[in-house]
Amino acid sequence: YQNERFLDRITGFAKEFDSDIVIPLDVSDDAQIFSMTEVLRDKWGCLDGAVHSIGFAPREAIQGDFLEGLSRDAFGTALDISAYSFPAMVKALLPLMEGRPASVLTLTYLGSERVVPNYNTMGVAKAALEASVRYLAASLGPKGIRANAISSGPIKTLAASGIKDFSKLLHHMESLAPLQRTVTIDEVGNTAAFLLSDYASGITGDNIYVDAGF
């Protein structure tokens, strides 16, 4: 979890899965990434999969005009937290996955490929994240480890609440998607479970769209 503000929420979530593993993690701090790895090593000894679902950009970088909200600090923060953190975590966790048919997964969004109003710098970060997936797949492939991404349609989450006019984005998708609706967290989760499983053993370096056909 990121900080004390999220502790109760994450603890409750862990209990739903009968887990007592709740680890503080600021992905901008390499020491905390290493500490997370050591906790998991002590607890499990090995790892079959990992899901990266982390993204952040300062508010001024995800509203209004792209250039007006642009700054070196905001740009760097978005890339660090939303993109670099995935390969950084995979590198730290790799010793726990070597010798196993493991799989790593991240979450992205269409704003990496198309201009989405107010998504701005986060779209650039997601593009970097998707490129990282392809390079990870090439690096991990000889070890039998797969790397993929899920590009989900917009879902009401804590992170999404920071995007200006997010509700308009939801309604836009509902009106144009072939299924005439948004997707659910369960639908994204089901796809993640598939990609992490042996049923997806031939899939790596890919970006799977779960967006009601949008």
Q: What do the predicted segments below correspond to?
A:
Residues 45, 181-210:
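C-terminal substrate-recognition "lid" of short-chain dehydrogenase/reductases
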